[in-house]
Amino acid sequence: MSCFSQAINPITGQNSWQERGDDYDYHLEVANAGFGDMLHDWERNQKYFAALKKTIAGMREAGREVHVLDIGTGTGILSMMAVEAGADSVTACEAFLPMANCAERILAANGAGDKVRLIRKRSTEIQVGEDMPRKANLLVAELLDTELIGEGAIGIYNHAHAELLTEDALCIPARARCYAQVAQSPLAAQWNSLKTIANLDGEPLLHPPEQLKSCQGEAALHDVQLSQLPSSAFRPLTDPVEIFQFDFQRKQEREKQRAQLLKLQSKQPGAAELVFYWWDIQLDDGGEILLSCAPYWAHPQLKELAAEKGNDHPLPNVVPWRDHWMQAIYYIPKPLQLVEAGKSFHLSCHHDEYSLWFDAREEAPTKSVRRHTCTCDLHMTYSRSRIGQINQSPRNKRYLRYLEESIEAEKSNVLVLGNGCLLGLASSALGAASVLLHEPHRFSRRLLESIVKHNQLKNVQFLDKVEELEDSQLAALTHIFAEPYFLNAILPWDNFYFGTLLTKIKDRLPQNVKISPCSARIYALPVEFLDLHKIRAPVGSCEGFDLRLFDEMVERSAEQAVSLVEAQPLWEYPCRALSEPQEVLNVEFSNFSQEHSLKGSIELKHSGTCNGVALWVDWQLVEDNSPRSIVSSGPSEPVVPGEFVKWDMFVRQGVHFPRRPKEPITHLEWSTAFKPELGELNFTFGQKKL
């Protein structure tokens, strides 16, 4: 039986009803649950297994029975490890029913169906005597996220110790330690604040208003693969320091709120703009089995891992890869200037039950530092990547070059399409006679209105709908400009909504109006990812346990609920190019409604496994042959087959993950079907050996 659900089509901007099976939401949740990524984390799996073997053997030697509780069992992998390690009884709980049902089948397939009691509940709903016969004396769980406590670990451990565990219970992991490193990074700071927009001569065009300068930003973490941040892009001002410990094993409750004030000294002069954050866990009681989420430069096993992997991987990629536990950036509310090496300052570290926040001050604060929130609309409206994109100087210069060469003072009448288009506002500062700004989003509009007021721009008018434009306004237009950027866009080509808006007014536009961008090209590039492909790759077996039933479940769900192309920030996920990029679609915005059906083949020029296809959009600002007239959402440097691709760091690209071929391939075949009036843009890919 089918049902209909409503969704916004980003290309048409229309709400549409889509026919989906009754179990669509179930398939979507299964496909996006992220269990596969964890199961590809070989270090996590090996060390959990080693800790279970060591702990259970130690309990046996002490003459104790071993009764295990596995909270959030997922596939049942940790429960099967506990059985293999010799536990007397194992109880597992899993509240996500599709996963629990799959775990039941996996346990049976691995001969553990009658050895593990599976409870389809949250651990906080379990009652001893009703759901499990006795309290457990060994808890094994994976309740952690990038922030460590963001998935509710504090409350879950507190409840387990109070209700489900014996007084002398052991836990795997036993403890966690959190680390902070204060740094300066002009590049990373672009993800958090708005810079002045200047013309090509460096003269200011738009200044941020005072409310943006005084805003402390959002305290929420910015999770990134920190090892991929170029070493040239930041200055470490301190060594990593331990800020909090979490003892998962102690019977006493873990505090839901704590503060730590550290007096530190700067290693070199700079601005304390941000905090790099990560954690490690001691999986066994003795602290001998350690798993660290540190970036490569702070990883305790860097030398051994570098020697082991040799020249196959760049140094930032020799440490174990995982996408479920990354590192985080926290932005200091007001950057602190440290004018010399050895300068003392105070780092305030805080956590509540689910999150952390930080502050840096020269003097010790006299009272607790409250968690800060956005007061300027910027941080609450736009993603980190969009804020960085607004600040991206090389990109902005290409738009400003077009505007400076195209706008005639007191003569040009400009229509700006898109959300948060400060570059469009810059046309007013460049002398345009009038600027009509299409900005239907309430918070984005409020932010732009504050910028207009602060910069005393007198000739700007805001619009909710392009259809509301009068014929006289349209007839007077000389320019239509966009980046384009729209808040509903996820994939780069979702910003083709620019073309949809143009078609609504096309018949009423003067013939000589200049439209920029005039066209857009989508490129495809076969690549070999070092690691990213694992998020969609089948697991097969893990530590000797057969997980093919899990693979089948995820594959069925992915076929029904996951797009063939998904958005990823590829600068965080290294990949080698296997060929040159190939154009797979060219759209002229003056004729946007034209349908396209294309196909082609890309010859692989470098040996390697094609485990991904990267896609992006190049925006052509004006019809000429200058590379400066192109703004790309893809590689930031020319692509060379066999070499790692350097990607734009302020936008997400599209990625297709092909199935692993049974034999080496020589060509990637592709087809593109674009129906703009329906907002349908579909790609298919096939791998062939010729």
Curated annotation (Swiss-Prot):
UniProt GO MF annotations: histone methyltransferase activity; protein-arginine omega-N symmetric methyltransferase activity
Q: Which UniProt keywords apply?
A: Methyltransferase, Repeat, S-adenosyl-L-methionine, Transferase
Recorded source organism is: Drosophila erecta
Has UniProt tagged this entry with the keyword Kinase? Answer: no
EC number(s) stated in the UniProt entry for this protein: 2.1.1.-
Domain SAM-dependent MTase PRMT-type intervals: 14-357, 366-690
Q: Which InterPro entries match?
A: Arg_MeTrfase, MeTrfase_PRMT7, PRMT_dom, SAM-dependent_MTases_sf
Q: What class of enzyme is it?
A: transferase
Q: Which family does it belong to?
A: Belongs to the class I-like SAM-binding methyltransferase superfamily. Protein arginine N-methyltransferase family. PRMT7 subfamily.
**Pfam families tied to this protein:** PrmA, PRMT_C
GO BP annotations listed = peptidyl-arginine methylation
What is the protein's known function?
Answer: Essential arginine methyltransferase that can both catalyze the formation of omega-N monomethylarginine (MMA) and symmetrical dimethylarginine (sDMA). Specifically mediates the symmetrical dimethylation of arginine residues in the small nuclear ribonucleoproteins SmD1 and SmD3.
Name of this protein: Protein arginine N-methyltransferase 7
